[in-house]
């Protein structure tokens, strides 16, 4: 039986997201918007598209790796993926508390993180990844049903936007924040972002490429975001924490552009191999870049970088992390291709 080749386009798509996210983190930790005001013009669009983009890519890959197969064959792999992302949250969250907050390495520091009662900064998204894959596992049967019925899936995605109107102020339990959001601290609630998971499934299921209907829908969604943004008295961005319907809808056109760009890049493999490598090892790059950035900020608190220097820092960090993958990965394994989820 022939082995299905890995979909390189979605790896490139994820690689673009990683490239943007790590650059954004470098700017946030080592730049100053007062001194380098242009940095915020990069941070805002990267913030807009990144988490939604990862949710989309997760839905896309899960459709190929899991929902196209019987539950009995894949449930343990989904659990393993969720466990990996949870461990990544534990490591990143602990590193943030130790390096950035200068907390002591004690049980009182680590225990709340392990129990999901503490969501350290720049690590919450990893907890949300865990919730996302667990939600995808718990809803395996209905999601598989929706994936086979395009219009039902699109309707469900639209209806999920209504969850952005829930009373966030009534939610105070920390473990609920990655699921449904809160106003108490920054979080990435997977229920509100779940429309992108469904869209990712549908794109994978129906092999969506360029489609005028998709382009029009994405343009309307992003246009609504732009209208809300620019029509405000102070022209401030729509609410991100917790996400408003405008914020969730906002990146649609940009992400569709990323998606089409990645499909074009797929036709020219050699120049974009580094992006593919980022996309195949998303979780490792996000985790290790966080740990290295936290450690560097702790060691170099006065370091101040402009846009170009922050980019060089990002490339250095990604090179170090890529080297760590290269020295522990066997060539035969590197050559093997699969559609399994790697976050």
Question: What is each model feature region?
Answer:
Residues 1-343:
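Alpha-helical transmembrane segments and their immediate juxtamembrane cytosolic regions
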């Amino acid at each position: 039986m022939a082995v299905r080749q890995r979909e390189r386009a979605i790896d490139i798509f994820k690689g673009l997201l990683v490239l943007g996210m790590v650059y954004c983190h470098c700017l946030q930790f080592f730049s100053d918007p007062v001194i380098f005001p242009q940095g915020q013009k990069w941070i805002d669009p990267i913030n807009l598209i990144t988490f939604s983009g990862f949710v989309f890519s997760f839905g896309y890959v899960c459709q190929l790796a899991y929902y196209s197969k019987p539950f009995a064959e894949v449930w343990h792999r989904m659990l393993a993926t969720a466990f990996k992302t949870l461990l990544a949250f534990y490591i990143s969250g602990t590193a943030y508390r130790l390096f950035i907050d200068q907390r002591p390495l004690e049980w009182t520091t680590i225990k709340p993180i392990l129990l999901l009662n503490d969501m350290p900064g720049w690590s919450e998204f990893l907890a949300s990844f865990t919730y996302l894959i667990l939600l995808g596992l718990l809803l395996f049967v209905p999601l598989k049903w929706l994936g086979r019925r395009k219009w039902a899936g699109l309707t469900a995605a639209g209806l999920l936007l209504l969850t952005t109107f829930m009373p966030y102020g009534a939610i105070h339990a920390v473990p609920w924040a990655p699921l449904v959001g809160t106003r108490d601290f920054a979080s990435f609630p997977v229920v509100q972002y779940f429309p992108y998971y469904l869209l990712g499934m549908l794109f994978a299921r129906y092999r969506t490429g360029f489609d005028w209907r998709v382009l029009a829908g994405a343009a309307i969604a992003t246009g609504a975001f732009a209208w809300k943004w620019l029509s405000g008295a102070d022209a401030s961005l729509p609410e991100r924490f917790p996400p408003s319907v405008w914020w969730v809808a906002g990146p649609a056109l940009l992400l569709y552009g990323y998606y089409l760009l990645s499909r074009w890049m797929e036709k020219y493999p050699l120049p974009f191999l580094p992006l593919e490598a980022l996309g195949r090892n998303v979780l490792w790059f996000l985790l290790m870049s966080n740990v290295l950035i936290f450690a560097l900020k702790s060691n170099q608190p006065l370091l101040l970088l402009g846009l170009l220097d922050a980019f060089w820092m990002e490339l250095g960090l990604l090179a170090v992390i890529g080297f760590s993958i290269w020295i522990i990965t066997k060539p035969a394994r590197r050559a093997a291709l699969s559609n399994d989820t790697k976050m």
